[in-house]
Each structure stands twice: as C-alpha cells, then as structure tokens.
Amino acid sequence: MTDVSAAAGGATAEPPTATMSPTSVEPLTNGAKKSAMATTTETQTAAAAAAATTTPAATTTVTVTAAATTEASTSNQVKLARVENVLGSTSTSSPANETKPKSLPDGGNASVAPASSSSNSISTQTLIQSQSQPHAKTNKSTTVASQQDVDEVARLFEEKPEAFEKWLTERAPPEALSRLHEFIESRKPPKRPSVTSDLFQQWMASSPTVQQKSPGRSLSNSSASSLPECRRHLMDLDEGELFMELIRDVANELDIDVLCHKILVNVGLLTHADRGSLFLAKGTANNKYLVAKLFDVTQKTALKDAVTRASTEEIIIPFGIGIAGMVAQTKQMINIKEAYKDARFNCEIDLKTGYKTNAILCMPICNYEGDIIGVAQIINKTNGCMEFDEHDVEIFRRYLTFCGIGIQNAQLFEMSVQEYRRNQILLNLARSIFEEQNNLECLVTKIMTEARELLKCERCSVFLVDLDCCEASHLEKIIEKPNQLEQRPSRAIKSADSFEEKKLRNRFTVLFELGGEYQAANVSRPSISELSHSTLAQIAQFVATTGQTVNICDVNEWVREHNHQIRTESEIDSTQAILCMPIVNAQKTVIGVAQLINKANGVPFTESDASIFEAFAIFCGLGIHNTQMYENACKLMAKQKVALECLSYHATANQDQTEKLTQDVVAEAESYNLYSFTFTDFDLVDDDTCRAVLRMFMQCNLVSQFQIPYDVLCRWVLSVRKNYRPVKYHNWRHALNVAQTMFAMLKTGKMERFMTDLEILGLLVACLCHDLDHRGTNNAFQTKTESPLAILYTTSTMEHHHFDQCVMILNSEGNNIFQALSPEDYRSVMKTVESAILSTDLAMYFKKRNAFLELVENGEFDWQGEEKKDLLCGMMMTACDVSAIAKPWEVQHRVAKLVADEFFDQGDLEKLQLNTQPVAMMDRERKDELPKMQVGFIDVICLPLYRVLCDTFPWITPLYEGTLENRRNWQDLAEKVEMGLTWIDHDTIDKPVEEFAGCADEDIKDIEFTVQTLNCNQQSQETDAHTTPEHHRSGSRLSMKKTGALGKAVRSKLSKTLYNSMDGSKPKTSLKLLESHVSEDMDDKSPTSPSQPHGGSVGRMSASSSTSSAGTVVDKTKKRSKLCALL
C-alpha cells in the first residue's frame, strides 16, 4: 500500500504511479460510505487521462497519474489532493463504477476513486463538527485528521494562496463550501435580533408618502412564538446579567413602538409584574398631557396587537389627573399597595375588562435634562407577592434611566424621519407649483391633500382673498419704484377703524374644502351671507385681517373671547381644534387663509404641527401667486398679440400711397446720382427717396431674381419710411443715405463680386431698416432711464429693437418681400439682416475690428467663409452708417449740425430727467468743442476703418479721401474755435463759418487786425466795469486759450509779422494788433481805474503812437519782448 502523504513527501525524478491493491484497502464503514456519497464532486478533464478501473463492491482502486515532468509539480498535485481529502471532496463512483479524470491546478490529471484511509481520510462534516463542538463525542466510525495533514494544508496555503483560492472558486464542491460557510458563521458572535441597525436605511428607502411605520419585520421579530425561548434563556441568567442583557435589548432600538413594547416586557421580567402601560408626554408648555403609547401589555402580548389597541383606544391623561398624571406633574414615584383604597385610582377600566388591580408602581421617565418624557406603570406581581418592594422599585428606577435615553433617541429618530418625509413632500410641492401653474384648483387640492396626510387631520380648507389682480394694476405694483424723496401724508387712524377697513378689504371669493381620505375636494364661491353665517369663515377672516396664526383648542371659548356669534351649532359641535394660518405672496400681502380642522386622534394641534403647516402655507402662497402671475402673463400675451395686430395695421402704408408709387415712373440711377459716393438727398422730395430705393433694388436685379411682387416692394418701402420717427438725424433720410452708400460700394466699389445675390438683398434691407423707430437717444440713455427697451434687450438695445421692427413689418400683411424664398433661403437672408443691423452698434464694431484687421494684415483675399463674410459685412455696415463723414464738406458740415442738435436734445433730457451732467458731445453748453470732437471721432473710428477697406478694396478710395478732406476742415475749424472765430457765438449751428475775408487772394498787409476782430474788445454789460478785470470775463470773448497761449494760426501770423519788423524789412501787417495784445495784457495786470476805458486799448493803435505818458505807455521794445514771450 502506497500512502498519499508519503508520495507527496517523497523525492522522485519522474512522476510516480501509485497503485493500491484491493487487499490493501480497508473496507469503508457505513458512516464513511455515507460521508463519501454526500461529498460527490464533478470532475473536469483537460486532456486524455488514464482510464480508472474499479473492482466489485467494497474495493476501490486509486490511481494517480501526473502529467507534469518536475518534482515540484508532482508535490503540488499531491498537496491539492490532500486539500480535497481533508475538506471531504472525495467523489463516489459512478453507476458504472467509473470515475472521471479531474484536472489539478498545476496541470496534472488524477483519477480518484472513493477511498478512505484511517490515517488521512476525514469528512468535512466531521471536521466542522469537531471544531465547532469540541466537547461533543465523535462518531467511532470517523477518523480525525492528523496534525501532519493540517500542516500540509497550511503550508500549501502559504506557498500557493492563489492556487488555493482558484480551487475554492472553481473546483470546491457546493456541499463543502456550504459547510465551510456554516462553520465561519458559527464562529461569529450571534446577531441581536432586537437591534434594527438598518432601520433608518429602510426608512429612507421606503416611499415617504406610503410607508408611515417601520418595516413589518419589527413587529414580527417580537412574535409570541419566539418569546418562550427568549424567556427560558433569560431565566438562566443571574440578576446582573439579566439586567445588562435587557438594557442591551433596548439600547439601539429606534422604532418607538418596538422600544416601548420591549420596555414593558423587560420590566415585567425584571420585576415579575403581570402587565404594564407606558405613557409619553405631549403638548405645549402650557398644556401638557400624557398619551398612552401602549396600554395593558403583558409578557405574552404581541407587539402588533398592542399597537393596534393603543391606536384604536387612545387614552389621554392631563398632567395632575390620576396616578400617571400626578407622577408626570410631580416627577415623583408612586407605589400603591392596594389600588382600590387610593382615591386617585380609576376603577372604570377594571370594570370594563374584568381585571382586578391590586398593586401599582408608577414611575416617571426623564431625559438627560430632567424633563418628563413619559411615565411607566406596572400592575400586580406574579410571583405571589402582593406589592412591589424596595428591590423592585430600585430595579424599575435603574432600568427606566436607560429607557429614557432610548426613548429620546427613538423620538429624535422619528423626528428625523418625519423631517425627511416633510422635505420630500415639500420638494414634490415645489415641482407641483411649476407643473400645475395653469390650474389653481389642482395645485391647491394637492397641497391640501399632502398637508392633511402629514398632519393627520380630518378636514382642510383654503380661503382665497379677493385681490385686485387686473393686469395693469398688477404690473404697476411690480414695476413701481417708491420715490425716496416723496413724502406721503400720514394715514394714522384708530386701530378699530383699521381692523374694520382691513376686514372689508379682505373678502373671500373662493373656498377650497377637502374632507376625509376618500372625499374629493370641493371648490365654491361663497356669498357674503354664507361667509357671515360660518364660524370657520369668521375665524379665517380674523386671521386674514390680523395676519396672525391661530391655534384653537376650544372653538366655543375662542368665539366668546372675540365677541363672535355662533350661527351654526352643528358646525361648532363637529369642530374641536383648529389651526389657522395666513397665506401671503411675495409682497407679504395676505392672499388667503389655510385651515386645519380636528386632529385625527382628537388632540389639539402642537407647535410642531404649526411649524410644518407653515411650510405648506408658504408653498401654497407661492403656488397661488405663481398661478396668478401665469394667468396675468397669458392675458398680457394675448393683449400683446392684439396690440401687435393693431400696430401692424397702422404701421403699414395705406393702399392709396402704394398704388401711386406703383404707377410712378422711376428714373434711372444716374439721375439720382446713386452710383456716386457724393450722393446727397437734400434735393430729393419724399416720393423721390422711395423711387430711389426702388431703383436700387431694380439695378441689383433683386426684383426679378427673387420674384418680389412690385406692389409688395412698394408697400414695404412706404411702410419702412412710415415707421421712422421724425427725429433730427436718425430718420428715413439717414436710412436712405446708408442704403445708397451700400449700393455704391457694391456697384462702384465692386464689392458685389464678394457677395451672393441673397446677401446683397439682406444688406440693402438691413441698411434701410437699421434705425427703424429710432427715438433720438442712444443705448446708454435707454439703460440709464431703465426704459422698457433696456429691460427687454440687455445688449445692443436699440439695434435689437430695430431688427424686431423690421421683422414686424415683414410679417405684416402685404409687406413680406421674402415670400417667394425657400425656407432655407429665408433663414439665410434673415440671419444676414439680423447680423448686419446688430453690427451698426459701435460696440460690436470694436469687437470685430481687431479680427478684421488681422485677416487683412495676413493678406486675406477669399472672403467666402461664413465667419469672414460676417466680419466683412459688419465692417461694410459700419462704413455705410458713418459715411456722412466722407461726403463733400458742405454736406458733412450740415449733417454734423443735425447730429449735434439731436445729441444736444438727449443731453437736455439727461439733465431734466436724470439730473446728471451729460458728456461733452451732448452738452449744449460745450458746443464750441464740437469740431475737436469730430476730429477725434474721425481719428478713432472712421479713418482706421476706411484706410483698411481702401487698402483691401481700392475701388472705395473716395470714402477714405473724403474723410481725410473733412478731417482737415474740422481740424482747421477746431483751431479757429480757439481764436473765437466760429459758430460758438450763435445759439444754433446754422450759420457759415466766419473766415478772414480775402485771405486767399489779398495781401495781408491790406487787412487791419483789430482787437474787435478777435472778439476781445466787447465790454461786459452784466458786471461791474470798475471792479471786474477784462481777463475774468467770458472765455468765448478772448483770443487766447484758457492757458494764456494763442492759437496756432494766430501764432503763425504774428510771428511772421514780428520777424519782418525785427529784420528791418517792410512789415506786411500793421503792428497795431501786437500792441493791442501786449497793452491788453499789461492792463490786465494792473487795476482798472474808473477813468480808464474798459477792455484795455481800443481802436487803431500803431507802433509809432506808443509814446510814454505818465508811466502808462509801454515802450515798443518792451512790447516786442513781451510778445516774444507770448509766442
């Protein structure tokens, strides 16, 4: 006989084959046979294996054939076989007395027949039983594993843990794994069935609207069938162990019903009491009472029965009434030996149940702060004693100390669960506010249903106040901003009058009533008579008037206190408690009243109920307010549609004008000078402007290309002209000039080669509509005044409005010039129009300019990409919008005055409405700075734009050249302003610029410059001539800047005269002007006497007449030195 362990431990060079003869195998005992039959394994074959032969009945041959070629693999195979042997994985023979080959982890194959050896064979069941029950006697027919086998298994696990794990997962028999699992579980400490550690997770996982109690498992765990075993186990413990075991039993219990039941059962075990009751403290600080959580619970009473009985027959005991009430009030224990002899004992319960109460032990349950949270009461001893002794009292007191902690924890847990459910309900209500915003009845019904279910009340009502919800007044209340400077008169009146006034104002118009669980909500509109005869309506009226929350425990008493009359006795008889709360909107205005009537258990509403109900009232107010706002918004939208229809009708040109324009003969483009960059509209009448627009459309071949009906085009042009306001600059003629410049750029400037026909159509439409309904004010003014346009459009305010007006005209009947376009072309052209109109905002120009300059600097010549085309169109729109700066000087000068007048009008509005100082270009008092500001505008915006366009597209050079010419004119005008020679002396900018007459052709020597020419000789008539120096007068009358320096032109002329006189040559200009300047300056430095003429030297003062007299005449040399310093 070859032993498996010996083969595993032997050192052989080749894989051995061990054959066990039938005579060398000991016969299996019946127990071993049964064990082997119970541990059959399914073998797996990886390759061809040696066939296993079996002998009849009681003989089994074990053949081990190794496929590995190394000693280590052979050893591992045998070790794994040893593991199988130790864990009982021997397989029984098949019905054909054959065994299937089994693959080992190391690659070997083994044919194993069910064999057992007295030295190394053991079943898994025997091993587990021997380890789990060390003191039990083993079966004589089983063999215990030797220490060597255990060491071999441990060594294999240490050397090959991965192989061991693989064997367990892949080849271990299910029976062995099951026994191993049972063995592991038996080594763990027993799990306490009373502690529901996963209770909170089950609460959270359950539906908050359906699951209201802890899972039913808590009730079934304490069933009567398991009590006898528990009781026998506890009876075997001594008193200390029993006490600690019962404390552990309630320590971690979170279900308040289960906890109270365990407390009463455990107290009965500790004190041998027959039955017990547990009361929990409820109510407010001024109205405390006890509620029987569980009543008359014995050790055999099931939890489910106890809870059902307590819920159906709720017992309420006020503090100070009865034995339990007295204990709760005094916090003192009461031990009664004979209950019927105590006056505080109520024998009615005994009479109902037939039970006789002898001894009573009643003790308070306090929390860690010493406040009463409950009262426990036990009745009658069961061990033959007639009373509870001091030992029972001490045990009862000590146990209730721990129970107080458990009860408070359970109550906190219950509060957290209730808060969780409350939050879930409020989230659902928040969703409902948006889901049901168009149906007030459904929304209020859903809120009332949730409130009724959560707060356990019989009925719920909502009264809605008759509010002034008309659209106009409602919007006025929202938009109206109180003026801080406005002082409103005091409206102090008597409180009684104020109450009556509010009462009349807060009249209910809608009543929502929700009854029992299966009753539908009732919506009614009660009359004034019905409201006056309803006590509930009177209470609601009181709450709506005062804005206070009312929690009524006794309706009759409240009615008497507030001097109300009880009109309906049946209504009062069915009402015990009312919780009434106002519903307010976002403006803190009472819009309704919510009522809860009667708690389901008959107790008053608590502060906790009021707190929860407040959240419902808030959500109800939000829902009602949101629904009313939604209804008002829908009405306003309907009104807006009607207004748009009216506006569209009045914005459309009338039929007579359309027919007249349709029949008119449109002249050629050359007659209107449309191809020229010097086009001007001053000579065109209004009808000619419309004909010029038609000619541009026809010259671009847009009418035939896009099949635009001619009458529709005429009507659209007239409608566009009609929708421009008669402001000074941003009017219809400005739109015509912008469109003509775009036409000239496309035709004369050859820009049409970069555009498609659809884009040309969009650009011309955008130019004509880019300032529709302009009000003569810019975007900044709209933002400052917070106009409706600024509220509607946050960026590019006026430009968005212009585009919307364009769309409105196109959508008007008979004005859609895009009607023949396909949907794709329509979207494309509308996108072009929108982008082009928005590009006229200079803020957009500055955003796009850098990107456009970068493309130009990189030598871009292909402008067909979408982004590049958008940049190009934006630059072209800006170039057309400011093209007046490139017109001939006569036209540019006149247009600039129109722009300035419009800007000055806006500045006046800012001073009047906003009480702010406008910027310089809009300040009428600084109109003399306009030429300088024009130069800045050209340098910052116009010249960079036209320069880059001219460099890229040389055919539009006239725009750049015209801008340069106008810049020179404005610069010259700005210099002359410094001399006081321009329009600043006029109230309006409508006179030509003052010039030096004949400066171009005549010799300067023939022109006599005087102080009067420089506006320095005019005397002030408004100030005291004796005390006011000349240099303190109006700056517009001086010839020098405020800094004392002369203008550039004046310095040039004066220096030329000075140099000619110094080198002895004949001066071309008289030095009278020089002497006047110097004399005036000298006079300014000395006080003016009454005898001297005001304003210094006046008249014709030559150089030869400057003789000294009485120290007042300055020498000619000194004058020239002073003049040089001045220059």
UniProtKB/Swiss-Prot annotation:
Residues 255-407, 439-624 form the GAF domain. A divalent metal cation 1 binds at residues 734, 770-771, 881. Gene3D superfamilies: 3'5'-cyclic nucleotide phosphodiesterase, catalytic domain (1.10.1300.10), 3.30.450.40. Its main location: membrane. Residues 1-147, 206-225, 1018-1045, 1078-1127 are annotated as: Disordered. Residues 1125-1127 form a propeptide. InterPro entries: GAF, GAF-like_dom_sf, HD/PDEase_dom, PDEase, PDEase_catalytic_dom, PDEase_catalytic_dom_sf, PDEase_CS. Residues 654-977 form the PDEase domain. It is a lipid-anchor. It is an enzyme of class 3 (hydrolase). It catalyses: 3',5'-cyclic GMP + H2O = GMP + H(+). Residues 1023-1033 have a biased composition (Basic and acidic residues). Residues 1117-1127 have a biased composition (Basic residues). A divalent metal cation 2 binds at residue 771. A lipid is attached at residue 1124 (S-farnesyl cysteine). It is found in: Cell membrane. Residues 1-19, 36-72, 116-133, 214-225, 1099-1114 have a biased composition (Low complexity). Has a role regulating cGMP transport in Malpighian tubule principal cells. PANTHER family: CYCLIC NUCLEOTIDE PHOSPHODIESTERASE (PTHR11347). Belongs to the cyclic nucleotide phosphodiesterase family. This is cGMP-specific 3',5'-cyclic phosphodiesterase. The gene is Pde6.
